[in-house]
Amino acid sequence: MTKKYFGTDGIRGRVGEFPITPDFMLKLGWAAGMAFRSMGACRILVGKDTRISGYMFESALEAGLSAAGADVMLLGPMPTPAIAYLTRTFHAEAGIVISASHNPHDDNGIKFFSGQGTKLPDEIELMIEELLDAPMTVVESSKLGKVSRINDASGRYIEFCKSSVPSSTNFAGLKIVVDCAHGATYKVAPSVFKELGADVTVLSAQPNGLNINDNCGSTHMEQLQAAVLAEHADLGIAFDGDGDRVLMVDHTGAIVDGDDLLFIIARDLHERNKLQGGVVGTLMSNLGLELALADLGIPFVRANVGDRYVIAELLERNWQVGGENSGHVVCFQHTTTGDAIIAALQVLLSLRRREESLAQARQALRKCPQVLLNVRFAGGENPIEHPAVKEACERVTLAMAGRGRVLLRKSGTEPLVRVMVEGDDETQVRGHAEDLAKLVTEVCA
């Protein structure tokens, strides 16, 4: 059954435009409260990133949940994976995150976690959607939900992150720069690394509600690259606005993406005989990652793009490690979802164990040239299905003679068509990608 409101990563859009409006959030809170309360006593955690609209939507959700008879525990600004963790540890029925992840401040969204800290099953999302289309009724006064605030949420999550590494871990002597994207990690991330002994320079940790992801964080790496070089740091770590993506910069200023991080983590677990099964990537994962893992004897499979698909594949195979080149990295041995701080800690641990720099660690993964271009798509006929586009993709695939890949897909979170071409000749790859992007642009017009 097709969902009306929920996309691949919850509900997301422009603030003030349906469905990202206060009245919809009120109804969504009520519908979610009714759905979860139908399963028994109901307590729901609500957290958010640092967008100014988060206050407005937090109040609306709080009112709707209470009207349905659900008790609410407010966490304030917290990373998305922290809300998943706290939902489990407080034995709540669900967790709600108010965030649009790596998008600018004028977007916002909602995503849910189950009581186990995992993505909601489709059947519960469909139940919520069905209730959204029903008349809103308020429970009698004696059954209204109560609202409280958890004041030590940050401290609890900081201790959890530190517990993901051995108690003897000490990063003394390691000089790092951390870019918090003026987002949800602005308090907890610097504390985690400092308390583990690292010398930390902090960037973009002064959120004002409007500057989240604004030329900073994992989608704008230039500031971090410059700071790593200026500070003569060993490496830099960049988070996105809600703390579920991480990218790094080595001491030379080179960007280390999700494929690199996934390889470093998987290789470390494999060498210590602690890798359960293989590794899950996505259709966008670089071919070089697949080949490098194969050289180590590590199985690799591709899921659809989106962390929920990576997680679903991991669960189906009972594997532990997966991720996307955008920086979503899942380590099931520690978490139930992608957690940027946890992933960064596992990389730092690997570097310490092998006594190598981040630049040295990434050299073992030889990537194929890959070009990704985005084409604005406002809706209407799917350009990927257009005969001319299909024919062009087939022509490019033939031209690369089995030495590359072509992938066109619609973004699940933004109005974009993503054009990816990968092969062993960078000039050829870029030319093919630009030609395909131009054709898709013409078709969209």
From Swiss-Prot:
One of its GO terms (biological process) is UDP-N-acetylglucosamine biosynthetic process. The keyword S-adenosyl-L-methionine does not apply. It holds the Pfam family PGM_PMM_I. Mg(2+) binds at S101, D240, D242, D244. It catalyses: alpha-D-glucosamine 1-phosphate = D-glucosamine 6-phosphate. The active site is at S101 (phosphoserine intermediate). Its cofactor is Mg(2+). One of its GO terms (cellular component) is cytosol. Activated by phosphorylation. Binds 1 Mg(2+) ion per subunit. PANTHER family: PHOSPHOGLUCOMUTASE (ALPHA-D-GLUCOSE-1,6-BISPHOSPHATE-DEPENDENT), PHOSPHOHEXOSE MUTASE. Belongs to the phosphohexose mutase family. This is Phosphoglucosamine mutase. It comes from Pseudomonas fluorescens (strain SBW25). The lineage of its organism: Bacteria, Pseudomonadati, Pseudomonadota, Gammaproteobacteria, Pseudomonadales. The gene is glmM.
